[in-house]
Amino acid sequence: MTQAQRTKIERLSCEKDGITINWRDCTVSHFHFIWLRHQCECAQCGSSLNGVRGLRLDLIPESPKPHKYSFDSDSLHLIWDGDGHASTYEARWLRDHCYSAEERALRKHQPVLWDKQIETDPPTFIFSEVENSSSRRLEMLQAVCDYGFCKVEGAPGLAQEADRLVELVGTKRITHYGDFELSNKKMSDTSDDIATLTEKDSINNVGDIRQALQPHCDETYRMSTIGITIFQVFEPSTEGGHSTLVDGFEAARRFHTEFPDDFEELVRTPLTGQRFDPKHAEGELPRWYRCTLPMIRVDEDQEVCGIRVNERQIAPIDLPYDQVVPTYRALQKFLKIVYDPSLMISFPLTKGDSLIFNNQRVLHGRTAFKLEDPGRQVLTNSVDLEDLYSNLRILRRRLKPEEPLQTYSQGMVT
């Protein structure tokens, strides 16, 4: 069945509470009158796409009805009782917005879950191809959406050019760390402003240590946490420092299968992540962030849509007395799954390599590495999740106009 046939109206009937459409592909859709009246996008009513609407929902009759209707294979036309307002709906638009359970399920993006087996063939792209080809850029963004991560090879090797990759994903997010963060180092005196790793008297950022880091999500202490993280390697470690990744959605799936009651415990129990950050330079102020959310978030279909795992940032648990032990029990079981080697992939990142991942799905870490000169240089930038989705929608509509609009996981958004 072609897309053209899928969006052609074969038959239509006006029922008591709405319109029933029989499509050429034998699918049936039903649209309530109140929904149709509210979704009119004529010049007078306006569109939700730009937020310029003359239509007020509170002024629509509670049970609006048309006194006249007509249709052809490509459109539906209604004249409404009362004010005689005329509404026209394109068949393609109606099919793309059909809210039957079957159509909503078809539009909902389904992530591709993975474990250690993906290590031999992770989704990988070449920077020059992605930068110069909209179709390759779409494939890269789709891979991040599907798998939660991808590698990019041959990316710019200087911090001043790092935005070339970042902007292919979305608008760079600025936090209290500044325009970008060079992890594992102090700023050097070099002209390109790239930092190198040096021994420090005290550690305020876990990225400054050389020991192995267990898989985790970043910044669980923020109410609006990082969506997409982008690592760009300027100087790799020659010994150790391999990146590690875990699919948090697959870990949650196993957790739910093996321990359903404990899974529900972490879905409903709010845990506080916190971070105290002393001032880094003269004139800066210290900061103390705290955010309280569940570790696992599910959507309206009870499917996992967001993960927020960083045991190092869990503040002293503040729950009713009888919830403390069950919560710890659930945490221990979940973290054992998260840290299971059968879920973890590990690979080196060489100079010019980049790693893009969904911080609200994929946990990241690294193996220990040796202190060297020149030191390990890895640039960290981030992009909001909705920016990646925005670019994905625009590219899909331009390059694959026949495909219906997809709905994407909203991560940890409450």
Language model segments and positions:
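Motif-centric detector for short Cys/His coordination patterns
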Residues: 1-133, 137, 141
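Active-site environment of non-heme Fe oxygenases that use a 2-His-1-carboxylate facial triad
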Residues: 98, 109-149, 154-155, 159-171, ...
